[in-house]
């Protein structure tokens, strides 16, 4: 495998991560003198502020996911590659990825965030985070399965346990999920 990116005399800007920051930078470089390579582990940009809507069945995942190749389909000197980055060699101006090594002139790391459990192992092991489309779908599936089980459950304690939902964290995503209509409404 490899990147299969044509040689050019232009300086190459490699952007790791296609979230808001990476996407905005790629857009700003639209009419620049650079060759731009965007690398992301997903082939789509997701809109995180609406993940709670996917988790609560208000939206489908494709309503908040936008393929990079479609976003940049008419761009010259722009290349998207689906890959995971494993390492950076600043002295050699290269990155190591799941599809090979790539040279760069300028490197921008805009890889996003991960869920921070603040060292709480119980929450880490027992919770369903919601930072990605996949996690929002997993949360939605769990909520719907629990609601279906509760519908046929005859044991009041078991039914209550199935209907209990604990939101950990008071950020925007947790608050929006907590206040959004449930799938049974």
Q: What annotation goes with each model-predicted range?
A:
Residues 1-12, 79-166:
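FAD-binding core/adjacent interface of flavoenzyme oxidoreductases
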